């Protein structure tokens, strides 16, 4: 992954977006934003992710963005210190979403900018994520934000939950 430098100080296109730590009150809005993008509601998934993020409050890296006082987007990330045979601290971007009314208003960019700042302060050297190979809009967004293909291969193994041997 390339290390994209932060913009020079001054007026940024993300300045109208307030980015803050995610909290329990954000759950329903996060679920609703994700449901529009994914086509399904995943309240339990986000409840578990939010509970984990709040419990790790000292290392909170999950954020929401507000535009005009309303939650307009979110990013959920996790920290890893040596898992999967990687010696340096890394982070995983687990989920990101922007309300459809706020797309094109640099909300996602503001979220990633703040996430990068937070992770850099924690001395995290790499941010990783996974994207469906046919989600071209998200792939284009991540490319624009400096993500490149990783030198790792994600593997799947189909399991049969009805088979007990």
Where do the language-model regions lie?
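Conserved acetyl-CoA-binding loop-helix of GNAT-fold acetyltransferases
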Residues: 98, 104-117, 144
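Residues at secondary-structure transition points
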Residues: 84-88, 106, 133
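Conserved GNAT acetyl-CoA-binding A-motif
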Residues: 119-131
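Acetyl-CoA-dependent GNAT
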Residues: 12-13, 17, 21-25, 32-88, ...
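Loop/helix-junction capping segments adjacent to catalytic residues or to phosphate/diphosphate-binding pockets
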Residues: 40, 105, 136
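Conserved active-site alpha-helix within GNAT-family acetyltransferase domains
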Residues: 109, 121, 133-151
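Terminal substrate-recognition subdomain of acyl/acetyltransferases
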Residues: 1-12, 130, 143-165
């Amino acid at each position: 992954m390339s290390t994209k430098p932060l913009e020079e100080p001054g007026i940024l296109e993300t300045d109208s977006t307030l980015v803050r730590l995610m909290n329990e009150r954000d759950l329903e809005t996060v679920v609703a934003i994700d449901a529009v993008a994914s086509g399904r509601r995943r309240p339990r998934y986000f409840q578990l992710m939010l509970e984990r993020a709040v419990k790790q409050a000292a290392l909170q890296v999950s954020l929401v963005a507000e535009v005009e006082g309303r939650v307009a987007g979110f990013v959920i990330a996790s920290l890893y210190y040596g898992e999967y045979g990687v010696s340096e601290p890394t982070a995983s971007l687990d989920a990101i979403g922007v309300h459809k009314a706020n797309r094109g208003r640099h909300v996602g960019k503001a979220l990633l900018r703040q996430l990068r700042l937070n992770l850099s302060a924690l001395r995290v050297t790499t941010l990783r994520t996974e994207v469906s190979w046919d989600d071209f809009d998200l792939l284009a967004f991540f490319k624009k934000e400096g993500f490149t293909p990783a030198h790792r291969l994600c593997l799947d193994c189909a399991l049969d939950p009805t088979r007990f041997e």
